[in-house]
Amino acid sequence: GLKDMIKNLAKEAAVKLAGAVINKFSPQPQ
């Protein structure tokens, strides 16, 4: 239902945000 969709969207957003934060604060070898 709608609640599950919202839950999944929130989960995806949290995962993306966590990934962005990790990328920001992790040294990136170039």
Swiss-Prot record:
Protein name as it appears in the record: Nattererin-1
UniProt key word Nuclease: no
Tissue specificity comment: Expressed by the skin glands.
Example of a GO biological process term: defense response to bacterium
UniProtKB keywords: Amphibian defense peptide, Antibiotic, Antimicrobial, Secreted
Residues spanning the membrane: none
Functional description taken from the UniProt entry: Probably has antibacterial activity.
GO annotations of cellular component type: extracellular region
Main localization category: secreted
Compartment(s): Secreted
